[in-house]
Amino acid sequence: MKSSRIFASICAASTMLMAPHAAIAQADKPAANEKAGEIEPQVRTRTMTGTFGGQRVSYRATMAETVLESDDGKPEAVIVTTSYVKDPRDTSRPVFFLFNGGPGSGSVWLQMGAFGPKRVAIPSDARDDGAPPYPLLDNPDSLLDVADLVFIDPPGTGFSYLTRDTNPKKYYGLEQDAEAVAKVIRLWLNDNGRWNSPKYLGGESYGTTRTAMVARELEGGTYNDVGLNGLILISTILDFAGREPTPGNEMAYVVTLPNMAAAAYYHGKVQAPSVEAIVEEARQFAIGPFATALLKGQDLPDAERAAVRAELARLTGLSERYLDQADLRVTSQRFYKELLRDRGLTIGRLDARYTGRDFDNAGETPDNDPSFYGIDAGYTAAINSWARDTLGFETTREYQSIGREPGRNWEWSTGQGRGAYLNVAPYIGQAMRQNSQLRVFNAQGYYDFATPFFGAEYSLK
């Protein structure tokens, strides 16, 4: 099913009376100029047409800087949004606010790979993107036939940045980031006269964590709530216990087992009627005999250990000897290296269909992630060409597809208690209890080890 059709099914019932609004200036504004504590936000707008979901749509593409200020009026952060709005404007259309994850990831991945009006043409069968040029094609599966789109790059991602005197701790953190993104959303609604339009949030990977936090910020019971119609979670990570295989935390081994089975099936290491069949077998084994065996620890009887080890080998394609040496607990990093070691290959973390070759085949973990270096050059070229050459955005800043500064300085605390794993799933439940019409859509990938799909299923149940 096309992405636009999926989204249409989520928001089909959203009809509302729209309030009158002021006219919005459409002229380009100059590039940002940071002098004497003042910044003039840059705005670049182009009118375009495309066919999406079988419909011909005229739309306005706008890259704009939003300046966030301190309490005393000094600029602290410049956040870039890229919006695609149907022309002429129709305030009855939903507005879909989108962001990627990281923390530190720019919106290029969702914008140029999924929902935007253009997509970069790179192989979809897990082959390397190779050398330029990388064609930028019309995206018939964009959501522009059913919704207006706003891609947000938080500080430290994309072209967005903190001013030189801003303390990173004020923006680089779970709650600080959500507050900033929510503020940008409110300002965009102000500037575009869209307060009474249906509103959706969508995030990928850590962006799903951000979605939960921003939803809490917007609908948090402050008596100034922004009502939301839906949340779209892509490659969901809400409970981080499932991705931290620290000693004593057995959950990580349980929730990644179905991913291992899917990857082993794809690469011909296990036999099954289909990937769906092997995944379902792995699900049932993971929450049954496997979880029980891990929790028994040293009390696990030899016969039970042997039975679990044999089934684990059948599902993962790893040898019983290797599984015994790992005490039945194989981390994802080791799995990437071990699954295809006999072929001299490693597999990807973001997408286990990708394979790569390391300098040292005898190593314990991979040198790098072939599913990332297999696509990043194409996406980087696409977003820079689109923003600078097509939309005319002017900046000397490098586009941060994956910015390092946010991750280095990130504050992960939510006040849930010292030593607790981060879990934002309760905030989605809270948002749904406070808004009876809020709907949530979850999309996962069988081959995505960064955000194990079984972990997301567990979090949302």
Predicted features by range, described:
Residues 8-19:
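Bacterial N-terminal signal peptides
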Residues 193-206:
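Alpha/beta-hydrolase fold nucleophile elbow
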Residues 65, 120-194, 241-256, 263-273, ...:
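Active-site-proximal cap/loop segments of hydrolase catalytic domains
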